[in-house]
A protein has these predicted regions:
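Family-specific functional microsites
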Residues: 1-162
Length: 162
């Protein structure tokens, strides 16, 4: 399983993991080493950010805090990429169907856009609660800004994709 998901040198795996890493916008939370343990335990991963604050005496202090949006995005990228790696491998070995790099990229983008669309729909039409809308925005905004230089503030209500 470890070989299939992480260390297989087939271009499908390297292409998928490269796209996931490329989408990751958080410099402060470095991209993890991909291993079977990372994939299986992705739900337990936590991304911490360092913020500078002033102490009671006015001196600058660095404080680490849990970044819920970045954590959620990383969990989505790891789990969706691993699942897609598995399904494309099954197609390659069982159905004997090779995928080109453009097909792999398009399939991966379709998967991530589907997740983004599900989040937007849930936030704006199903739950409609400020905390969930904020979570969705915190999850996707930095990644979308990496792709769209003029991302509108109300992107959650628009047809924005990767």
């Amino acid at each position: 399983m470890d070989h299939i998901l992480t260390s297989c040198p087939h271009p499908t795996n390297t292409t998928l993991w490269d796209h996931a890493k490329e989408l990751w916008p958080h410099e402060e939370g470095t991209w993890p080493d991909i291993s079977l343990g990372t994939i299986i335990g992705c739900n337990a991963i936590s991304v911490e950010t360092t913020k500078e604050t002033k102490g009671r005496d006015g001196t600058p202090q660095k404080r680490k805090s849990h970044d819920q949006g970045a954590t959620r995005l990383l969990q989505i990228l790891l789990s969706e990429t691993a699942y897609l790696s598995w399904t494309l491998r099954c197609e390659r070995t069982i159905r004997e169907r090779e995928h080109t790099e453009p097909e792999i990229r398009a399939t991966w983008l379709k998967t991530i856009n589907r997740r983004l669309s599900e989040d937007k729909t849930t936030a704006t039409k199903v739950l409609r609660r400020k905390p969930y809308t904020s979570l969705v925005k915190n999850t996707w905004t930095k990644a979308l800004q990496k792709r769209h230089s003029n991302l509108p503030d109300d992107w959650i209500n628009r047809n924005v994709v990767f």
